């Protein structure tokens, strides 16, 4: 490390003080250093020191646009407490001073201090405003002339030579300074330490990478002396209090890894690899919410960095509103609630140090994080609706004005002299206003910004068309709009969004003729077939977003005048085909959009899910133009472009980071030149294409992190990829013809995930067994693979899966050193014994050996103390398991079905008594069917092995015979329950199942479910699954009065019924009380039922009905309301004609093949949140299908037994 980098902060401060020189002598000092290095902190220290002497100090944060003298002197006056920034309830006009008056007051205030010298600090110079701007253009230099010696201290990130100034370069912290910053967090770091971390720390220390085997020493090393990295991490750890397993894993990967791995991490996670900082990266990763939590935190994070880059610092309230405008909190039912969510995120950012506050409630991000790169995300434009921060650009004349949240609306702080200029409201709030009159009020006539979420009145367009001063108009999710012609007169618009208006089928061709200032246009979710050609003339247009316009058949010609475009996003325009025009034949094509080379500012291009058959050309060179490259384009997204046949010359895209053509099933050609000059390409995804080969130039994409070729069924051989030394993920699963992968993997030291499943490989790639950092090796269903090499060097391997490799007979070497393994799946292989020393892997969590028919015995597994899942189902020759499982306290699932075991291993008491544990014994000779009622005695009396004798009476309640099947049918079944299966009513005796809460009834001869419940004395059933019961014509027929006497509140919450041919009713007319608390109902293949309920089940939240041939209506009432129903799925109900209820709070709705169900004016209306398109043949185009495809939480399922 250079000597300069070891300069202490105290030494730098001394240099600065020396450079200021003697009193009475003007001077200029410039502090230069990267973002987050501490320049502003040093400036504050200097200001404190000189203030104690004879100095006045003035600060100017130049990370905001200062465009006029008035703004400049208002900033200075606020510092001197002459004026104050407005707060809620204040009227800004009362605080307003004329410019000359402001200057005089500033002078008077400075004279009061009786200090002869002045230090002017220009912080973050050049980010939004320059020194020249304020000193010369805004005449600050003249204003300060009466000070004979003005000393100027400038901080900036870039280094440039200047005359008559002293430049001091600020380097990293010294080791002692870093430790001082970390000192207060020592106890916190100790509390986060995992049990295996001390071993890793010792290894790093032994290798001389850190001085002491502590987390502090590790963070010190990885932080590279960047104070911002240390501060943000410590604040983040304090904020989260505890880390999830996923966060601990990331911590371990980023902080407890060898420095030799940082280069690959930099390639993946940093824009400028030389400035990659693992500690900053960790702080970002800790920001990500749990996968089950859908908060827009990450979108907001990337927005604040983009905002600062283009608009500078922001007033905190404005920043939250910008997040709302970008759609991060959609759907917005209440502006108040959306704002509160944004405020919560903003405070979290501040608590973590990601946002910092300046004077006047202005906030700035920790800009050192702007070097981060998250290729897993869709990018700023991929998640934003407007890109409004780029339109605004820090110019307060183009912003939102001074706004306030009041009465569930955001509006301008209203003064006595001026009208409201900004209104942001939801449809729910506007319902309280008189329709058609709200925007005609006198105080609304100067409106410049109008943002409406889900408005619901018809006169909207007419009212808005009269507001001629509008700059920003956003109408989001308004189904009632079918015509916007009158809005064409709003000539001053900079931003226009009309999205989610599924009834809008046409926009006049001349609509945009006079909107010459338009910069952002979002027409997503419309039913338009053609985009107005006058868009071509919008020379200031930056954002063109038409996502999910499924009827769109053409585009404007972007090469006419729209040269400033930064994003073109037409994702989901499924009818856009041919050549971006409505022509059907090449001879009719006139060259529209043939070449995009003139769009030199384009960053994001998304053609996903369109039917385009070609891409535009990206280079142009003629007598007047030389556009040989498009250096700004970073994302080219072509997912599911099913008619795209070839990739053209992509060489001009020199800074492309992501090329994604996954699902372009007709893609058959990729030119060699496509991958030339791709030094910045990080992700290449050609999955599910028809490419017969991969271009040889792949070898030159040296910084590639992910190579994804899943399900490329025609590729037989891959060219050498051994030069891709930064590769981390390599996936060729499903390439069924792939026989050979050329080149050696020996130098791919960063590779951590390899998937070779379902390929035709007979051996693994050369030297793949030497990759010590490999974490996942997945080789499922490689039917030609007979042997594997010695895997002893894969010391970081965590997942090893060779299931379905039916010819695999041998795995060489020992697993003794693979201490990180936590999942091993050897199912359906030809192995006669387990790999050597696998029984020594104390961290193993899953051992899955399904259908290993040659496996006769297992080694002693007592050391697998962390085992969670143990599955040997279908191992027909397995007749013995050595020793006891009693020490496996984490054990959750044991599947012994279909084995030849005669005895059962002793299970841990803590495990088997936990309500979330399952034992599957079906088709196992451990226990005979007629012995279920004496299961404890049966196991105890066996002459060999252990018994359940030590686990107590509750054991019997935790045994699962067949109910596991319902996890496959219905993935919303929670993980932490056991389903007791009653295939015949005599299988289990009453005493063992009376307390069951979840029960399945299959192929049972009983006439009703209630008779079974009575027979088995089951009074606390919460979930019931019923199928293939041929005699049942009614489910529940017990008397309602008797039910009420048994329980004041019935327990049944979930009911799933299928294949009941005689069922005509869910309950008799006197038995409906049992459904009082029902939340979820699924009815499938019940051909005789005509209606579901005579009364409204008030607590129903989810309803799915399909394949019921005689079902005429859902509810046998004239009209009712299911206020709690969130999800409705109706499929193939040929005579259903009436719903019979209103669903005001419906969130997801799918109605398919219900030909008689026609929307009528007198039909109770589905809630406004849903656009309920009913179709005979097609699913709703804007809804998600049955929730079985997207469960609310992941569920584990073993094979059906």
Curated annotation (Swiss-Prot):
SUPFAM superfamilies referenced in this protein's UniProt entry, alphabetically: L domain-like, P-loop containing nucleoside triphosphate hydrolases, RNI-like
Signal peptide from the UniProt entry: none
Domain comment as written in the entry: The LRR repeats probably act as specificity determinant of pathogen recognition.
Entry binding sites for ATP: 33-40
Gene3D superfamilies: P-loop containing nucleotide triphosphate hydrolases, Ribonuclease Inhibitor
Region ranges (Disordered): 1162-1201
One Pfam assignment: NB-ARC
PANTHER family assigned: DISEASE RESISTANCE PROTEIN RPS5-LIKE, LEUCINE-RICH REPEAT-CONTAINING PROTEIN 57
Compositionally biased tracts (Basic and acidic residues): 1162-1180
Stated name of the protein: Putative disease resistance protein At4g19050
Task of the protein: Potential disease resistance protein.
Annotated source species: Arabidopsis thaliana
Annotated GO biological process: defense response
Residue windows of the LRR repeats: 469-491, 492-514, 517-539, 540-562, 680-701, 703-725, 726-748, 750-771, 773-795, 796-818, 820-841, 843-865, 866-888, 890-911
Family label: Belongs to the disease resistance NB-LRR family.
């Amino acid at each position: 490390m250079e000597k300069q980098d070891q300069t202490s902060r105290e030494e730098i401060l001394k240099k600065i003080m020396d450079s200021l020189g003697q009193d009475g002598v003007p001077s200029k000092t410039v502090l230069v250093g990267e973002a987050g290095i501490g320049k502003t902190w040093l400036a504050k220290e200097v200001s404190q020191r000189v203030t104690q002497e004879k100095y006045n100090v003035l600060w100017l944060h130049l990370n905001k646009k200062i465009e006029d003298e008035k703004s400049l002197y208002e900033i200075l006056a606020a510092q001197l407490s002459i004026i104050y920034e407005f707060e809620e309830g204040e009227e800004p006009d009362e605080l307003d001073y004329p410019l000359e008056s402001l200057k005089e007051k500033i002078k008077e205030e400075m004279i009061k201090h009786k200090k002869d010298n002045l230090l002017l600090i220009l912080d973050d110079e050049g980010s939004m405003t320059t020194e020249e701007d304020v000193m010369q253009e805004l005449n600050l230099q003249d204003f300060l002339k009466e000070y004979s010696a003005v000393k100027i201290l400038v901080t900036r990130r870039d280094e440039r030579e200047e005359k008559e100034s002293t430049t001091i370069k600020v380097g990293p912290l010294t080791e002692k300074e870093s430790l001082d910053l970390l000192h207060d967090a020592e106890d916190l770091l100790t509390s986060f330490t995992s049990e295996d971390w001390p071993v890793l720390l010792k290894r790093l220390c032994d290798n001389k990478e850190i001085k002491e085997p502590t987390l502090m020493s590790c963070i010190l090393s990885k932080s590279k002396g960047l104070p911002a990295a240390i501060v943000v991490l410590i604040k983040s750890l304090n904020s989260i209090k505890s880390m999830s397993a996923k966060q601990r894993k990331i911590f371990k990967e980023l902080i407890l890894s060898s420095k030799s791995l940082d280069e690959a991490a930099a390639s993946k996670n940093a824009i400028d690899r030389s400035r990659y900082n693992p500690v900053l990266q960790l702080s970002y990763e800790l920001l990500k919410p749990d996968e089950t939590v859908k908060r827009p935190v990450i979108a907001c994070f990337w927005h604040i960095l983009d905002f600062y880059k283009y608009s500078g610092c922001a007033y905190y309230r404005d920043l939250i509103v910008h997040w709302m405008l970008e759609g991060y909190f959609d759907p917005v039912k209440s502006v108040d609630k959306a704002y509160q969510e944004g405020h919560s995120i903003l405070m979290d950012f501040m608590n973590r140090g990601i946002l910092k506050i300046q004077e006047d409630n202005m906030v700035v991000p920790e800009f050192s994080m702007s070097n981060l790169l998250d290729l897993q995300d869709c990018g700023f434009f991929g998640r934003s609706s407007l890109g409004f921060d780029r339109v605004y650009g820090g110019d307060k004349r183009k912003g939102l004005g001074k706004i306030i949240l009041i009465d569930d609306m955001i509006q301008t702080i209203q003064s006595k002299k001026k009208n409201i200029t900004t209104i942001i409201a939801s449809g729910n709030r506007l319902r309280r206003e008189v329709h058609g009159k709200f925007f005609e009020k006198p105080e609304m006539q100067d409106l410049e910004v109008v943002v409406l979420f889900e408005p619901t009145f018809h006169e909207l367009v007419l009212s808005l068309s009269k507001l001629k001063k509008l700059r920003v108009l956003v109408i989001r999710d308004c189904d009632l709009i079918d015509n916007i012609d009158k809005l064409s007169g709003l000539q001053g618009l900079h931003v226009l969004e009309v999205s989610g208006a599924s009834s809008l089928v046409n926009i006049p061709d001349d609509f945009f003729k006079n909107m010459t200032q338009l910069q952002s246009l979002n027409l997503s979710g419309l039913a338009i077939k053609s985009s107005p050609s006058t868009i071509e003339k919008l020379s200031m247009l930056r954002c063109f977003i038409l996502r999910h316009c499924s009827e769109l058949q053409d585009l404007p010609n972007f090469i006419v005048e729209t040269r400033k475009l930064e994003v073109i996003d037409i994702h989901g325009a499924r009818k856009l085909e041919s050549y971006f025009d409505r022509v059907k034949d090449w001879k009719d094509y006139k060259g529209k959009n043939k070449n995009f080379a003139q769009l030199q500012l384009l960053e994001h291009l998304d053609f996903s899910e369109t039917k385009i058959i070609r891409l535009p050309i990206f280079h142009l060179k003629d007598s007047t133009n030389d556009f040989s490259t498009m250096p700004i384009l970073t994302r080219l997204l072509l997912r599911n472009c099913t008619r795209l046949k070839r990739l053209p010359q992509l060489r001009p895209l020199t800074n492309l980071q992501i090329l994604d053509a996954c699902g372009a099933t007709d893609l058959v050609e990729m030119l060699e030149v496509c991958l030339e000059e791709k030094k910045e390409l990080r992700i290449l995804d050609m999955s599910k294409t028809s490419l017969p080969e991969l271009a040889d130039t792949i070898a030159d994409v040296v910084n590639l992190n992910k190579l994804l070729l899943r399900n490329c069924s025609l590729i037989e051989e891959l060219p050498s990829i051994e030069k891709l030394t930064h590769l981390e993920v390599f996936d060729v699963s499903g390439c069924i013809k792939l026989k050979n992968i050329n080149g050696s993997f020996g130098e791919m030291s960063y590779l951590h995930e390899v998937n070779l499943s379902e390929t035709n490989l007979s051996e693994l790639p050369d030297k793949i067994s030497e990759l010590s950092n490999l974490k996942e090796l997945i080789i499922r269903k490689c039917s030609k693979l007979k042997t594997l090499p010695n895997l002893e060097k894969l010391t970081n391997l965590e997942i090893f899966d060779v299931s379905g490799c039916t010819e695999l007979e041998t795995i060489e070497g020992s697993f003794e050193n693979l201490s990180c393994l936590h999942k091993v799946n050897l199912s359906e292989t030809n192995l006669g014994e387990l790999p050597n020393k696998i029984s020594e892997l104390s961290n193993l969590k899953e051992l899955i050996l399904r259908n290993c028919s040659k496996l006769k015995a297992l080694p002693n597994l007592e050391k697998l103390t962390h085992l969670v899942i143990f599955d040997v189902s279908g191992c027909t020759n397995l007749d013995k398991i050595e020793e006891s499982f009693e020490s496996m306290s984490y054990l959750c699932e044991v599947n012994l079905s279909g084995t030849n075991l005669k005895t059962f291993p002793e299970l841990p008491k803590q495990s088997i008594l936990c309500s979330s544990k399952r034992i599957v014994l079906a088709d196992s000779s451990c226990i005979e069917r007629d012995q279920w009622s004496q299961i404890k005695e049966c196991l105890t009396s066996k002459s060999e092995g252990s018994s359940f004798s030590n686990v107590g009476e509750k054991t019997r309640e935790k045994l699962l015979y067949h109910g596991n099947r319902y996890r496959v049918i219905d993935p919303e079944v929670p993980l932490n329950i056991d389903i007791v299966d009653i295939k015949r009513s005599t299988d289990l005796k009453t005493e063992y199942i009376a307390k069951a809460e979840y029960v399945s009834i299959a192929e049972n001869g009983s006439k009703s479910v209630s008779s079974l419940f009575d027979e088995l004395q089951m009074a606390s059933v919460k979930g019931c699954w019923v199928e293939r019961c041929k005699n049942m014509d009614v489910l529940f027929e017990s008397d309602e009065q008797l039910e009420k006497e048994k329980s004041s509140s019935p327990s049944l919450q979930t009911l799933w019924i299928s294949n009941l041919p005689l069922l005509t009713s869910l309950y008799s007319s006197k038995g409906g009380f049992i459904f009082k608390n029902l939340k979820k109902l699924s009815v499938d293949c019940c051909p005789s039922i005509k209606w579901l309920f005579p009364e409204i089940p008030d607590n129903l939240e989810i309803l799915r009905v399909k394949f019921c041939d005689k079902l005429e209506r859902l509810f046998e009432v004239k009209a009712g309301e299911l206020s709690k129903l969130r999800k409705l799925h109706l499929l193939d109900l040929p005579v259903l004609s009436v719903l019979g209820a209103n669903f005001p709070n419906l969130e997801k709705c799918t109605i398919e093949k219900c030909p008689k169900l026609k929307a009528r004016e007198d039909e109770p209306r589905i809630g406004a949140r849903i656009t309920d398109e009913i179709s005979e043949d097609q699913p709703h185009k804007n809804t998600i299908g049955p929730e079985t495809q997207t469960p609310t939480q992941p569920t584990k399922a073993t094979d059906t037994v």
